Amino acid sequence: MFLFGKQKTPKEVLRENQRNLNKSMREIDRERVALQNQEKKIILDIKKMAKQGQMNSAKIMAKDLVRTRYHIQKFYEMKTQLQAVSLRIQTLQSTQAMAEAMKGVTKAMITMNRQMNLPQFTKIMMEFEQQSDKMDMKEEMMNDTMDQVMEQDGEEEQSQEILNQVLDEIGIDLASQLVDAPTTVGTSVASKHQVNSG
C-alpha cells in the first residue's frame, strides 16, 4: 500500500479515522432527521385515513410507522456506537501525545545528565535524601506523640463524638474529604477536642 508513498504516522491514521467517523455520524443524523419527518407525515396520514373511514389503509400506514420508528431507534444506537469509537480514538490520540511528550522528557534528561557534573549531582542527591529522612523521622515522631495524646486523653467514644460534632457543623462536604485528607481531618478533630477540653 505504501510501496511508492510515505507511510502514514499513527497520529495521521487516527486523525483520518476520526474524520471518517465524524462524517458517518453526520450522515446518520441526516438520515434520522429524514425518517423523523417521514414519521410525522405518516401520523398525519393515519389520522386522515381514519377520519375518512379507510381503516385498512390506516392499518397499513400504522405498520409503516412502526418500521420507521424502529429504524429511527437503530440510527440512534448506531450513532451511540460510533461516538464510543470516537471517544476511544481521542483516548488513543492523547496516549500518543503523552508518549511523544515522554520521549521529549527522556531526551532532555539524557542531555542534562551528560552536561551535569556527576559528583556534584550525587552530593546534592545525598543531601536531599538525608534531609528527607530527617523530615520523615520528625513527622513520624509527631504522629506518634499525637496518637499517644489521643489515646490517653480521649477514648473511642469521645473521638467518635467529636468527629460527629465536626461533621454536623461542617456538613457532608467534609465526609467526602475524609478519604482524600485524613491528616487534615485528624488535625481538625484534635483542635476541636482542645477547644472542648478548654
From Swiss-Prot:
InterPro entries: Snf7_fam (IPR005024). GO terms for cellular component: ESCRT III complex; multivesicular body. Keywords: Coiled coil, Endosome, Membrane, Protein transport, Transport. GO terms for biological process: endosome transport via multivesicular body sorting pathway; late endosome to vacuole transport; protein transport. It is a peripheral membrane protein. Residues 11-42 form a coiled coil. Gene3D superfamilies: 6.10.140.1230. It is found in: Endosome membrane. Disulfide bonds: none annotated. Belongs to the SNF7 family. Probable core component of the endosomal sorting required for transport complex III (ESCRT-III) which is involved in multivesicular bodies (MVBs) formation and sorting of endosomal cargo proteins into MVBs. MVBs contain intraluminal vesicles (ILVs) that are generated by invagination and scission from the limiting membrane of the endosome and are delivered to lysosomes enabling degradation of membrane proteins. Probable core component of the endosomal sorting required for transport complex III (ESCRT-III). ESCRT-III components are thought to multimerize to form a flat lattice on the perimeter membrane of the endosome. This is Charged multivesicular body protein 2a homolog 2. It comes from Dictyostelium discoideum. The gene is chmp2a2.
